[in-house]
Amino acid sequence: MRIVPRLTVVLYFLVLVAACSSTPQTVPEYQGDYLDRAQSQEKDGIRVTAAVPSAAESKAIFGKPLYKRGVQPVWLKIENNRDEIVAFLPVGLDPVYFTPIEAANMSLKDKKKVSDKRSLINEQFFEAGMINNVPAGEQRSGFVFSRLDEGTKAFNVDLIGDSGFTPFTFFIPVPGLQLDHHTVDWKNLYPADQFLDLSSDELIEKIESETCCATDKGGKGTADPVNLVVIGTPDEVYYAFIRAGWDETETIYKGSSWKTIGSFISGGEYRYSPVSALYVFNRGQDIAFQKARANIHERNHLRLWMSPYRYEGEPVWLGQISRDIGVRFAKKTITTHKIDPDVDETREGLLENLAYSQALAKVAYLGGVGEAPIDQPRANLTGDPYFTDGFRLVLWVTSHPIDIADIQLEYWRVPPDRQSIP
């Protein structure tokens, strides 16, 4: 009796399901400015092009305010240059994606009782949906209706065939938000003669002599501890943190202010709310990320400042991370958060977050913050107490997935509670 390998069986059923669930039609390519922002990748005989329409573009295409319903269409074109059929797996793009007809009927007005049983069958959305199977030598294009992610949309496009599994990862900026880091000119952040290429010993000395904490604008008040060092290009930093589930943040303007106030009052989630400025190198943070939890009162905040230092050709950033456990109104920044006093727990949580997200290449520790025992805590600008072992976590981030088992350890310094770790 011939035993069929398990992978072959899985491939067979996936391709069969894709073939049965899709008709071999060619969906027209919808025109629009979003196609000018399309990105293409090619691997192992397959070329994938992806684009993400903005809220206005989505409404123009489909005639419905999809973003207001939490639906974000992602346009794909898959060109199969192999001699075998391949199947696109939409759950890789979004595990709980919407079907085309589901996306068409998500407003409350569409859910009223109807007498015409065909009224819920929206042929426009159905015809626009992505076809899952792509025969050899052919191409297919269409939309996948995913959950809404404003700012930079990060997603996978996974394909499977007899030759195996072929994954693609995209990070596509979507117009609509006024993001803080979009105004930063990275190339001219410092004069050219201020950039320093450092050896490991020189970097250790520089980092450990940097300020312990961020400050207020005047440089006088002591804010939260600068407990992170990140090494990587701006793009690697964006992609690593977005891959790990962090959201970009908006600047403070009228629109973001109203959204923040609304979230504060309702306790709702505003994933991209502005982050108040703290100062290192005499300027506010260059990038801020946040990870929302249940509501605006509970989230993690992360700030990064690019330093003038370079290590092995890569930019070195100083950073600060805190876990917010409450919120109150503030005169200058609309709201301000109360932080969890155990800032080391939050720091280590970031290490685990990046490692599990395959966004981390190497890790180390350095001093520089200064110890603050639990019985002698320090306070930040708003009077919130915190305690720490005084170490800075050094993270080499990557935009290319790295297995958690392949993360390297650099033993520059070892915190006391990790002395026994080999």
Which functions belong to the PLM regions below?
Residues 17-19:
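C-terminal motif of bacterial Sec signal peptides marking the signal peptidase cleavage site
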Residues 21-24:
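Bacterial signal peptide processing site
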Residues 28-68:
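Low-complexity, acidic Ser/Thr/Pro/Gly-rich terminal tails and inter-domain linkers that flank the onset
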Residues 58-75, 81-85, 133-135, 218-219:
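Short, solvent-exposed beta-strand/turn "edge" segments of beta-rich domains on protein surfaces
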Residues 79, 254-420:
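A cross-kingdom signal targeting lumenal/periplasmic-facing segments of multi-pass membrane
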Residues 81-134, 140:
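The feature marks short-to-medium sequence segments in extracytoplasmic or secretory-pathway proteins
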